[in-house]
């Protein structure tokens, strides 16, 4: 049986992996977006665990809102990434130093 401790441990491990991905790789935009998505999913696991433990479905409902925001964030991030690659021919964060049009 999966307990709250198992879900919290999994959420903490995934959050730590995503945090390490953000801090260790600051050059590639795709890895940064994937790390942010993994961070949101680890928070969702914690919401589901607490919702299940307390018997309140509002935490699981909140997960759907987070997933919707995460999908919109990924779509906008990838659109910006495609535009950035078309104009600058790079996805390296270090080479993008200004937001001039």
From Swiss-Prot:
GO cellular component: NADH dehydrogenase complex; plasma membrane
UniProtKB keywords: Cell inner membrane, Cell membrane, Membrane, NAD, Quinone, Translocase, Transmembrane, Transmembrane helix, Transport, Ubiquinone
Annotated TM spans: 4-24, 30-50, 62-82
One GO term (biological process): ATP synthesis coupled electron transport
Entry keyword annotation includes NAD: yes
Cysteine pairings via disulfide bonds: none
Catalytic activity: a quinone + NADH + 5 H(+)(in) = a quinol + NAD(+) + 4 H(+)(out)
Membrane topology: Multi-pass membrane protein
Subcellular location: Cell inner membrane
Top-level EC class as recorded in UniProt: translocase
GO molecular function per UniProt: NADH:ubiquinone reductase (non-electrogenic) activity; quinone binding
Keyword match Cell membrane: yes
EC number: 7.1.1.-
Major site of localization recorded for this protein: membrane
Assembly mode: NDH-1 is composed of 14 different subunits. Subunits NuoA, H, J, K, L, M, N constitute the membrane sector of the complex.
HAMAP family: NDH1_NuoK
Function of the molecule: NDH-1 shuttles electrons from NADH, via FMN and iron-sulfur (Fe-S) centers, to quinones in the respiratory chain. The immediate electron acceptor for the enzyme in this species is believed to be ubiquinone. Couples the redox reaction to proton translocation (for every two electrons transferred, four hydrogen ions are translocated across the cytoplasmic membrane), and thus conserves the redox energy in a proton gradient.
Family listed: Belongs to the complex I subunit 4L family.
Protein name: NADH-quinone oxidoreductase subunit K
Organism expressing this protein natively: Stenotrophomonas maltophilia (strain K279a)
Lineage of source species: Bacteria, Pseudomonadati, Pseudomonadota, Gammaproteobacteria, Lysobacterales
């Amino acid at each position: 049986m999966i307990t709250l401790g198992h879900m919290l441990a999994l959420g903490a491990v995934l959050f730590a992996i995503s945090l390490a991905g953000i801090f260790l790789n600051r050059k590639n935009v795709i890895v940064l977006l994937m790390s942010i998505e993994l961070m949101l999913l680890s928070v969702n696991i914690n919401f589901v665990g607490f919702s299940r433990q307390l018997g309140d479905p509002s935490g699981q409902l909140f997960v759907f809102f987070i997933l919707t925001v995460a999908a919109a964030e990924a779509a906008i991030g990838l659109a910006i990434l495609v535009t950035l690659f078309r104009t600058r021919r790079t996805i390296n964060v270090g080479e993008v130093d200004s937001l001039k049009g």
